[in-house]
Structures are given as structure tokens and as C-alpha cells.
């Protein structure tokens, strides 16, 4: 190898190289001139600068021998290894210090309130285009959520299931029997059969046939009560003490509005309008109202002669509109039925059908206490006129006609104390225009005026002017809307000593003595005493007068065949059930409802038996239909179709139509409350296990439906429930945004009275209600030792994090990593505003009512929680929800848990630049200067180094342990090689 150049030689070489490069681009000089320039440069004296000396030193190092170069490389590598090792060691020491630093404290119990100002554009009324900005102030109420958990109402009751019982039922449908009952013609019989076949075929096409285990039927005979109640539940017979009808052909009832179409207020149809005497302007010559309406006035009400018959001795009525307040329409039909039957039994005189005097109001009998029937009020005459005309013992006239009670235009101000000096001051200008005046003014006489010899079409002038324009004058006066000259007169109609009997009680008593068929036939005939059955009339008008009826009626002798029960197992797909009912003497129009009793082999409280399922037979006619014999042909078919379609729909939905099965015996045997029975009815399921046609002809058809029921028996019902919404808390830790939650052991909070229970549900199904196999009562989370120790989990989330969820009460659930509208960051809050405002890019609207304070029940124990400092890094490294601590750990336990978690993650390996950034993030809260330096190194390695060497640098860091081992081996080998190069003795050259 040639020796290196001296400093002067290197400077001359450098100068000559620069001169050659400069002359190559010059074209104005000749070759001789260029040679002369080079010669001149060679003879110039050059003084070396410091930079030249440094550059020469670098040249001399590279131009020396290979041994010297290797020594230089070795020293550089060793220095680099020492530097990196020291840096990594310092970073790891800082990392361990970061772990031991106390973390943040989370305390959710904070409430805030803020008033923010927003600019809104307001448009003036005079200008459509110009909008002016106005300042509005919006109140934002924020309520913290304890433990990051929101409780919202859980409307569905939760049922802890005790067991499930099974029941089977066979339903028979026979069109011929329905047709005979409704007196259908042959054409309508064909239509009825086609309709039944269509519905049943539709059901059969969606159901498969299969067998279920069935036992012997054990029947409950409730036929007498069912048929008697169905026909005569609200039917009564009242007997007068003396025969006396309504004393006049008219009734003054100004409290009732008048008929007609009026533009301002439309009143519902009043039944007394049927007796209204209308005004007609055109009448024949000499016409007067007395000739046609007797004492009734034009614009008043005329009572026909059949309603004021003086020979009436009894009143027969079938209506539930005269019962007292005990008959609450909000109750179910079953509850009203049971209540009525109990009252009738308690009020009956011995075993007779006559009721005690206290059942009636005092107006009917002096000993009356209105235990069953109420007192007739003033407005009853408007909608129930027949009840008033036939049952009232006295009547108070309500009149606003001039001349009644001696009031005229001259003394009208004396009729009411509020009308005194009415026209002598300005008082009349401030009152209602109807005040202190009559509804109908009396004229001198009633007359007709004819012109030009016309005798058939004359102008009629009644004695009282017509009131149609003031159709509700009297009704408003009755409501005391204004002072008026009301004339109230009491007139006695008949003596108040009535005797009353119940047709339902008579039916029950007669069915025991003469049989149910005989009792039904005789009492139905009695209801048809006047030619029209009373129980067919509308309930408001089902009141008729009778003259000396025979009661109790004569009961005919009806023979019935009877046979013993067939205990053999039911034969499938046969008419055996139909024949069994026939042999027992029950007609399909009123077949006995034979109800199965549940027996469970695991419950000795119930009736003993070995079969879980019991079979019973029921027919469509008596189970769901009303008496179609009172309907016309097409109406009866439509009625049957409605019930049949409803039955099919319920079966397809696997629901139970409880009109086909009575549940009172279920309640008695299971000993359940009314609320529990409501749940049993709602949660019960049905399954059709066969549908078959037993007979068919062009005009008749019959079907059988086998139905299996599953009844859920509740063990406990949780009604007042709250559902848990685990919102959590946001945490900015070590440069990472983390979503922290307390993992609560319950999903539902139940609060009954003052007791709060925390429920954990397992194996639940949601069918209208939530039905669960397992409901565990657990302890809530809290700092007290006796409470549950719940894990706290953390999950890394991206920033910015904004969660806005509207609640059903009009408020908003907000969890955000930023602050807006004075809503705090990181803390879950329930926000309520009083005006529309836009926050976090979402419009917040006010609730339906002003809410200044929001309270959520039930309350949970207070929870104050300290988390590890590196919670965000731990969650970030695993990128999934992990457990970072528990609710009862102290800070020492939390630090140990964090160390163990970080060591287990082995964060020192892997992507070295990313690890340095993690160290910088963890150090930023503890040592900002060191964090900046470490962050800079990490950015250099990830950005600059990546730009120079590409992704290979990052990939090599993942193989760092292997590369370090290989590098150490190579360095040792190189060291021995260099030592071998060292000379043992000086060489001559």
C-alpha cells in the first residue's frame, strides 16, 4: 500500500481536482489557456484552514492501514453499544419509577349547572329576508352518575319460574248446530260451512299432527252458572206497591241538549231525542199541539201512552247501567262477574230470588241503602228515559220556560239572587249572554196564520218560541255556567215501596229444582213477555213495563237422558267426543263446559294423580259465542266468523284464547293471587297437536281441534325494576384515552317498598314478560368490606371520544373526552336543557316538562376508586378490555398488579421506537424534560431512520435479542483477529 499524502500534497490534489472540474464546464478558453491556468494554480501558495485540517485527518484515517481502520471501527461500535445500553437502562429505570407513581382517583358523585349563551337568528315580522341575531340563555343541568352506572326503568316484570304445568283441550265445531240455533236458511248454511272449512283448513295447513299423553277427564260442571249468567246476569223484576204510571204526557228536561247538527259543539246522541217534539213552521189551518201531543209543548218532550200506562204493576229490565260505584268498568269482566254474583248471593232473601230492601236506593224503598243499585240522577233522563219514566218514584222538573214557577219577564231578576238589579247597572255586560233570561219565552197564544185562502200550508206560531238556536242553553244552565231563572219542581209519581227480584238467582234456583233446560226455556219466555226479548235491547233502554206477570214462571218438564262417564282413553280422529256429549244429554248450543283440573305428580297440595295432562271437551258455541239465535242469518255468520278467526289467530301465535277456558279453578287449586293469575294468563302458551274434520256435507261440517297448553307457574314476581346501563368513565392516563368501567355483578335493580335488591339473571326468555330460570340476589360494588369486590376494567378508545344517548325522560346521557357547553369532560353526566342547544355537534332538546333536578332511584353505595398510573398503557398494549384493579385494592396492591401486568406483556421487546414512545408517555406526568428527550429519540428512530433504511430497521428491532447475540460473537471474533495482526517484533521495512 502506498504511503498517504502529506498535508501540502493533499491540498494541492484537492485544488487541482476542483480546477479540473471547473474548467470542464468552461468553453471560452482554449486548451493552451486551460493548461496555463493549471500551471498557475500549481505554483500558488495555499494556507490550510481548520476545516482543511479536519478533512485531511479524516483522509489520513481512511488512507492508513487496515489494522488502524479496524481499531477505529471497534472503538466506534463499543461506544455505540455503551451509549445504547446506558440509554435503555435509564429508560427502564424511569419505566419502573413510572409504575410506582400513584394513579388518578375517580369519584363520580359530582353535580354541576351552567348557563351558556348562544346566538340565534330571529326573523322580524315585517321583514321576511332580514334575520337579526339575538342572544338566548340556555340552562344546562348536569347530574353525575354514581359508579358510572345509569338506572333506567325496566317496564317488563321479571318472573322467577317455579315450574311449568301442562293441560290439553279438545274443541269441537259443528256448523249444523250453529245453523239450527240461528235459524239459517239452506243457502246461508252452505256459506257457514264454507267459512268454517276455510278457516280450519288454513289452520290445519300450518299445523302438524302428533300425539301427546292424555289421561282421564275430570270435569267441573259450571254450566248452570255460565248459562244463567250469560242470559240473565243483569235482569231484574221490580214490583210496584200500587199501580200508577207517569202522571203527564210531557216531561220538562231542559238539562238535556236538543237534537240537530250544530257547528260549534256536537253532543253524543241522547235517547230522549226519540221523544222530542220538533218545531215545524208549516202546519194546516187550525192545527194545535194539544190535539197531537196532549200536554207536551213544542220544543219539549212527549211521553207516549205505552210508557205512562196506569195498569203497569211491574218493571222488567236487563241493564248494568243502574249499578252503584262498586261496579267498576276498569275491572275485568271476570272480576265484575265474581263481584256481582257475590253481591246477589249476599242480598238474596233466603233461598229465593227476591233481594233485600237495602239493595235498592232510598227513592225505591224507605229501607234502601243502595247496596246494589244507585240513585237515579238528573242527567239519567237524557240517555235512559225509560228507566226514569218506569222506575222513578218522584221527579224533579228542571225548567227554563217562561211562566213556570210564576217567573215571567217582569220578575225574572227575582228568580236568582245573582240576577238582582241585573239590568240596572253594567253588571249584565260582563256576564254570559244567556245570563238571567229564559230559554223559551211565552207568547199570548198558539195560532196559525193563513193567507190567500190557503188552508194546508199555513204559518204556525207556537205558544213558546222555538229554542233550536240555543240547543244547549239548558245544559249549560244546569252546569252553572251562568246565573239563570231555573224552575225546579218536585212531582210524586208513585209510592217508594218496591220489591225486586233477580232473574239470575231465579235461574240458579230453578235449575236445581227443574233442570237447567227447563229454567232457561221458562225464563227466556218470560223475558219475551212483551213480544221483544228485553236482553236484546240496548243496555240504556232495556226497561219495559208489565201488567200482572206470573213470576216465577211455570217451568215445563223436559226429560234428559243421562249415562255414566266413559273412563276409557279418548279415541283420536273419531266423533267419540261429540257422541259422548250427546249421550250426556247436552245440546251443542249449550254444552257443558267440562274443564280439566291440573294434577302434578310433584305437588301433593294439588289433586293426586299420575298424569300431568288432563283432557277436557269444550264446544265453540258455548265457550266464545253469544246467543246467535237472536241474530239474523248473515249477522250470525259474521259473528261466528269473527270468533273463529280470532281463535285461529291466537292459536297460530301460540297464545291462549281465555274465552275457551276458565281460569278460576286454576287459581283455586294453585292458590295464586289475582296478580299472579294475570301473569299466568299472559305467559301461557298453546300448541295445536291435531286438526281434523270429523264430518262433511254440502250444508254442514264439523271439526275437532286438539290443543296443548303450557302454563308457567311463577315463584316470585319482581315488578318495580331498574335496568343497568354501564356507562363507565373516561381516563386520560400516560398519553392514552381509556374507557374505565366497574364490572357490576347485577343487571337489574329491584326496589319494592324500601327494600333494594340487586339481581343477576340467568337463562331468561323475553315473551311479553322476562321469564327466568335463575334469579340471584347479589351485593353491589362499593368501598365497604361487606359489599361486593368488583373488578375494574379498562379499554383503549380513540380520541376524541363522544357518546351522546337520548333517554326516555327527555334528558341526554353524555360521556365525552372534550368539554362543550360547560359539560365536563371524562365524567358521565345526565344532561337536561330548558331550550334547544347544540353541543358536541348534536342538538339537545328540552324534555316535555321543566326538570330542575333529576333523581335516579335506587341509590347505590358510594364508590371512590384510585387506578394505576399506567392504566392507559396497559389497555393500549393489549388492545382489549382487561382487568386493571378491583374496588377494594389499596395502592400497594394496585402497583404490584400493574408491575405484574406490564412484565407479563414483555413490553421491552418488539418495536423499539414505539416502546420509547410508551416510556415517554409514561414519564411525561413525572419528568417532563426526560419525556421530551426520550420522545425525540423515539421519533428519530421511527421517522428519520425509517426514511433512511426503510421498514428494515423496524423489522430488525423485532429480532433484537438474536441480532445482539450474533453481534457479540462477531465482535469477539474480530477482536481476536485484530490481536493476531499486532506485530510481535519490528519489521525492517
Curated annotation (Swiss-Prot):
Modification(s) after translation: Envelope glycoproteins are synthesized as an inactive precursor that is processed by host furin or a furin-like protease to yield a functional hetero-oligomeric complex.
Protein species of origin: Simian foamy virus type 1
Transmembrane segments: 66-88, 962-982
KW Ubl conjugation (keyword) present: yes
Protein name: Envelope glycoprotein gp130
Site annotation Cleavage: residues: 126-127, 572-573
Sequence ranges on the Lumenal membrane side: 89-961
A Gene Ontology cellular-component term: viral envelope
Alphabetical list of Pfam families matching this protein: Foamy_virus_ENV
Region Involved in virion budding, annotated ranges: 1-15
Function: The surface protein (SU) attaches the virus to the host cell by binding to the cell receptor. This interaction triggers the refolding of transmembrane protein (TM) and is thought to activate its fusogenic potential by unmasking its fusion peptide.
Keyword Transferase set for record: no
Record keywords: Cleavage on pair of basic residues, Glycoprotein, Host endoplasmic reticulum, Host membrane, Isopeptide bond, Membrane, Signal-anchor, Transmembrane, Transmembrane helix, Ubl conjugation, Viral envelope protein, Virion
Record motif Endoplasmic reticulum retention signal, residues: 985-987
Residue ranges annotated as Cytoplasmic topological domain: 1-65, 983-989
Cross-link type Glycyl lysine isopeptide (Lys-Gly) (interchain with G-Cter in ubiquitin), residue numbers: 14-15, 34, 53
Further remarks about this protein from its record: Foamy viruses are distinct from other retroviruses in many respects. Their protease is active as an uncleaved Pro-Pol protein. Mature particles do not include the usual processed retroviral structural protein (MA, CA and NC), but instead contain two large Gag proteins. Their functional nucleic acid appears to be either RNA or dsDNA (up to 20% of extracellular particles), because they probably proceed either to an early (before integration) or late reverse transcription (after assembly). Foamy viruses have the ability to retrotranspose intracellularly with high efficiency.
Quaternary organization: The mature envelope protein consists of a trimer of SU-TM heterodimers. The N-terminus of leader peptide specifically interacts with Gag protein. This specific interaction between Gag protein and Env glycoprotein may allow particle egress.
Amino acid at each position: 500500500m502506498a504511503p498517504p499524502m502529506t498535508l501540502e500534497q493533499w491540498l494541492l490534489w484537492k485544488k487541482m481536482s476542483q480546477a479540473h472540474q471547473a474548467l470542464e464546464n468552461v468553453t471560452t478558453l482554449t486548451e493552451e489557456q486551460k493548461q496555463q491556468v493549471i500551471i498557475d494554480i500549481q505554483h500558488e501558495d495555499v494556507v490550510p484552514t481548520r476545516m482543511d485540517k479536519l478533512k485531511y485527518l479524516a483522509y489520513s484515517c481512511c488512507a492508513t492501514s487496515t489494522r488502524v481502520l479496524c481499531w477505529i471501527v471497534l472503538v466506534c461500535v463499543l461506544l455505540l453499544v455503551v451509549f445504547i445500553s446506558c440509554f435503555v437502562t435509564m429508560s427502564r429505570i424511569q419505566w419502573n419509577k413510572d409504575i410506582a407513581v400513584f394513579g388518578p382517583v375517580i369519584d363520580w358523585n359530582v353535580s354541576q349547572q351552567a348557563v351558556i349563551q348562544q346566538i340565534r337568528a330571529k326573523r322580524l315580522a315585517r321583514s321576511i329576508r332580514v334575520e337579526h341575531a339575538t342572544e338566548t340563555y340556555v340552562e344546562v343541568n348536569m347530574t353525575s352518575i354514581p359508579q358510572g352506572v345509569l338506572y333506567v326503568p325496566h317496564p317488563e316484570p321479571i318472573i322467577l319460574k317455579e315450574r311449568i304445568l301442562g293441560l290439553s283441550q279438545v274443541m269441537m265445531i259443528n256448523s249444523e248446530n250453529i245453523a239450527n240455533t240461528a235459524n239459517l236458511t239452506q243457502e246461508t248454511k252452505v256459506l257457514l260451512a264454507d267459512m268454517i272449512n276455510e278457516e280450519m283448513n288454513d289452520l290445519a295447513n300450518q299445523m302438524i299432527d302428533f300425539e301427546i299423553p292424555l289421561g282421564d277427564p275430570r270435569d267441573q260442571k259450571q254450566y248452570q252458572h255460565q248459562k244463567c249468567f250469560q242470559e240473565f246476569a243483569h235482569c231484574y223484576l221490580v214490583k210496584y206497591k200500587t199501580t200508577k204510571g207517569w202522571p203527564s204526557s210531557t216531561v220538562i228536561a231542559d238539562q238535556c241538549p236538543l237534537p240537530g247538527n250544530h257547528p260549534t259543539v256536537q253532543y253524543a246522541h241522547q235517547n230522549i231525542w226519540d221523544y222530542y217534539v220538533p218545531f215545524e213552521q208549516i202546519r194546516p189551518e187550525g192545527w194545535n199541539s194539544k190535539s197531537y201531543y196532549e200536554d207536551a209543548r213544542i220544543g219539549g218532550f212527549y211521553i207516549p201512552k205505552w210508557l205512562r200506562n196506569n195498569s203497569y204493576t211491574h218493571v222488567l229490565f236487563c241493564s248494568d247501567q243502574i249499578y252503584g260505584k262498586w261496579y267498576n268498568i276498569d275491572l275485568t269482566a271476570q272480576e265484575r262477574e265474581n263481584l256481582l254474583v257475590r253481591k246477589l248471593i249476599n242480598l238474596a232473601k233466603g233461598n229465593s230470588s227476591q233481594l233485600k230492601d237495602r239493595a235498592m236506593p232510598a227513592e225505591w224503598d224507605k229501607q234502601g241503602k243502595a247496596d246494589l243499585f244507585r240513585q237515579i240522577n238528573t242527567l239519567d233522563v237524557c240517555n235512559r228515559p225509560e228507566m226514569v219514566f218506569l222506575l222513578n218514584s218522584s221527579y224533579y222538573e228542571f225548567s227554563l220556560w217562561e211562566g213556570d214557577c210564576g217567573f215571567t219577564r217582569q220578575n225574572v231578576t227575582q228568580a236568582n239572587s245573582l240576577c238582582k238589579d241585573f239590568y240596572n247597572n253594567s253588571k249584565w255586560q260582563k256576564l254570559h249572554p244567556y245570563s238571567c233570561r229564559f230559554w223559551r219565552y211565552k207568547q199570548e197564544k198558539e195560532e196559525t196564520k193563513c193567507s190567500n185562502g190557503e188552508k194546508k200550508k199555513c204559518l204556525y206560531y207556537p205558544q213558546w218560541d222555538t229554542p233550536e238556536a240555543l240547543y244547549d242553553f239548558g245544559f249549560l244552565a244546569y252546569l252553572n255556567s251562568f246565573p239563570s231563572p231555573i224552575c225546579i219542581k218536585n212531582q210524586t209519581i208513585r209510592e217508594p215501596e218496591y220489591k225486586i227480584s233477580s232473574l239470575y238467582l231465579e235461574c240458579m234456583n230453578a235449575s236445581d229444582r227443574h233442570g237447567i233446560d227447563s229454567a232457561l226455556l221458562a225464563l227466556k219466555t218470560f223475558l219475551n213477555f212483551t213480544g221483544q226479548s228485553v236482553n236484546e235491547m240496548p243496555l240504556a233502554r232495556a226497561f219495559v213495563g208489565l201488567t200482572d206477570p206470573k213470576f216465577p214462571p211455570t217451568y215445563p218438564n223436559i226429560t234428559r237422558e243421562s249415562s255414566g262417564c266413559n273412563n276409557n282413553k279418548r279415541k283420536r280422529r273419531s266423533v267419540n267426543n261429540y257422541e259422548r256429549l250427546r249421550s250426556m244429554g247436552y245440546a251443542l248450543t249449550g254444552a257443558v263446559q267440562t274443564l280439566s283440573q291440573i294434577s302434578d305428580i310433584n305437588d301433593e297440595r294439588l289433586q293426586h294423580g299420575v298424569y300431568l295432562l288432563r283432557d277436557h271437551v269444550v264446544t265453540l258455541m258455548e265457550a266464545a259465542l253469544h246467543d246467535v239465535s237472536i241474530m239474523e242469518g248473515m249477522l250470525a255468520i259474521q259473528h261466528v266468523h269473527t270468533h273463529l278467526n280470532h281463535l285461529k289467530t291466537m292459536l297460530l301465535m301460540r297464545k291462549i284464547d281465555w274465552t275457551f277456558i276458565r281460569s278460576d279453578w286454576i287459581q283455586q287449586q294453585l292458590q295464586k293471587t289475582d296478580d299472579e293469575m294475570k301473569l299466568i294468563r299472559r305467559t301461557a302458551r298453546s300448541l295445536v297437536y291435531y286438526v281434523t274434520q270429523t264430518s262433511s256435507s254440502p250444508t254442514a261440517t264439523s271439526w275437532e281441534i286438539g290443543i296443548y297448553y303450557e302454563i308457567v307457574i311463577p315463584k316470585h314476581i319482581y315488578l318495580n325494576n331498574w335496568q343497568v346501563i354501564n356507562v363507565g368513565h373516561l381516563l386520560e392516563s400516560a398519553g392514552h384515552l381509556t374507557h374505565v368501567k366497574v364490572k357490576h355483578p347485577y343487571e337489574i335493580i329491584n326496589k319494592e317498598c324500601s327494600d333494594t335488591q340487586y339481581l343477576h339473571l340467568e337463562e331468561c326468555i323475553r315473551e311479553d314478560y322476562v321469564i327466568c330460570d335463575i334469579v340471584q340476589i347479589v351485593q353491589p360494588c362499593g368501598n365497604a368490606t361487606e359489599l361486593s369486590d368488583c373488578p375494574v376494567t379498562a379499554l383503549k378508545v380513540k380520541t376524541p371520544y363522544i357518546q351522546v344517548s337520548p333517554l326516555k325522560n327527555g334528558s341526554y346521557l353524555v360521556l365525552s373526552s372534550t368539554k362543550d357547553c360547560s359539560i365536563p369532560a371524562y365524567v358521565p353526566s345526565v344532561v337536561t336543557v330548558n331550550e334547544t342547544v347544540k353541543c358536541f355537534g348534536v342538538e339537545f332538546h328540552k324534555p316535555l316538562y321543566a326538570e330542575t333536578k333529576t333523581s335516579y332511584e335506587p341509590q347505590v353505595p358510594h364508590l371512590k376508586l384510585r387506578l394505576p398510573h399506567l392504566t392507559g398503557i396497559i389497555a393500549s398494549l393489549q388492545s382489549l378490555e382487561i382487568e386493571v384493579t378491583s374496588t377494594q385494592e389499596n395502592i400497594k396492591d394496585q402497583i404490584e398488579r400493574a408491575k405484574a401486568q406490564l412484565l407479563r406483556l414483555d413490553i421491552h421487546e418488539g418495536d423499539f421506537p414505539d416502546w420509547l414512545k410508551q416510556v415517554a408517555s409514561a414519564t411525561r406526568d413525572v419528568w417532563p424534560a426526560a419525556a421530551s428527550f426520550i420522545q425525540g429519540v423515539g421519533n428519530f428512530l421511527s421517522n428519520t431512520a425509517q426514511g433512511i433504511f426503510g421498514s428494515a430497521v423496524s423489522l430488525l428491532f423485532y429480532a433484537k435479542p438474536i441480532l445482539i447475540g450474533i453481534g457479540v460473537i462477531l465482535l469477539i471474533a474480530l477482536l481476536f483477529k485484530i490481536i493476531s495482526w499486532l506485530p510481535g517484533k519490528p519489521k525492517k521495512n
